[in-house]
UniProtKB/Swiss-Prot annotation:
This is Imidazole glycerol phosphate synthase subunit HisH. NCBIfam families: IMP_synth_hisH. Keywords: Amino-acid biosynthesis, Cytoplasm, Glutamine amidotransferase, Histidine biosynthesis, Hydrolase, Lyase. Its EC number is 4.3.2.10, 3.5.1.2. GO terms for cellular component: cytoplasm. InterPro entries: Class_I_gatase-like (IPR029062), GATASE (IPR017926), Imidazole-glycPsynth_HisH (IPR010139). The gene is hisH.
Amino acid sequence: MKVAVVKYNAGNIRSVDYALKRLGVEAVITADKEILQSADKVIFPGVGEAGTTMNHLKATGLDELIKNLRQPVFGICLGMQLMCRHSEEGEVDCLNIFDVDVKRFVPQKHEDKVPHMGWNTIGKTNSKLFEGFTEEEFVYFVHSFYVPVCDFTAAETDYIHPFSAALHKDNFYATQFHPEKSGKTGERVLRNFLDL
């Protein structure tokens, strides 16, 4: 199986690569369109700022390529947000794979800290990514923007209010949390994606 990780100006690519290696998978980290198109699975990770990153994707043509991939594609954190219609971070139009907008967390109480950082449970899982999961699985989040619960929600969590911990539509899968930083639970998410 050929797994490609999209290389672009976003952090966290190496930690995804290490997580895949722990599962015995040698991924190719690349921006080469032919390699991405011919891969069996594509992972679209990211830590960064939505506006700057979308500008880079558009300048390189990776925006159109990612939208048109037909194999399973897995967006992580910023990768998930960039798969949405629009982001309040940078007020930028995104890939519009998921017809939903990315919103900024607004603290409601003094103890609400932004970014949402740390371990949280996920529930209402509705995707093959979460095969074998219980209702109380802990995963690791680091983000200041979120995707509301919507028709594409594949898992939910709650911080300040309920939001999408994962999305799924056709061949596109995505998590707001970082499976590569979520221990054995995260490894199971990655393995379930690779087994699709």
